[in-house]
Amino acid sequence: MPKEVIERYRNSVPEEVIQIWEEYGLGSFLNGYLRVINPDDYKELVEETYFSGKESIPLFTTAFADVITWENNKYIGIIFYREEDFDIMASGIKYFFYDIYNEREFTDDYFDLKLYEKAVKKYGELEYNQSFCFFHY
């Protein structure tokens, strides 16, 4: 993660996010399903497509092109672009990370990990800047 990005968002995102950026930079976790992103790469998209976009900071994306945001300096939100929906996932980053690794119901509610595993098996692992997408005929 570029140092200027870290400094720009240092007082706007949780310290845990700053630590991830400083220690690991860009990358993925949850077997590649979630990606750590540069907020600047998604800020314009979120501002133009999400009613709360100007107050939201993009933090992560999913393998299905959903965007996870930091909202109102206290919530983790998710924008489900393929479903044209959004939700608040957690009240704080600590709860978000705890729930990802400890609450099956949480991941079932917000992430389609089974579909992701099937897609990876059929099409292979994604590159960092790729997502699985759905086409309506």
Residue ranges of each PLM-predicted region?
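A sequence-composition feature that detects small, non-aromatic residues
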Residues: A63-A65, A90, A119
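Compact, glycine/acidic-enriched structural inserts
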Residues: G77-L115
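Low-complexity intrinsically disordered segments
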Residues: M1, F111-Y137
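Context-gated lysine
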Residues: K3, K43, K54, K74, ...
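A surface-exposed partner-binding patch
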Residues: M1-I78, Q130-Y137
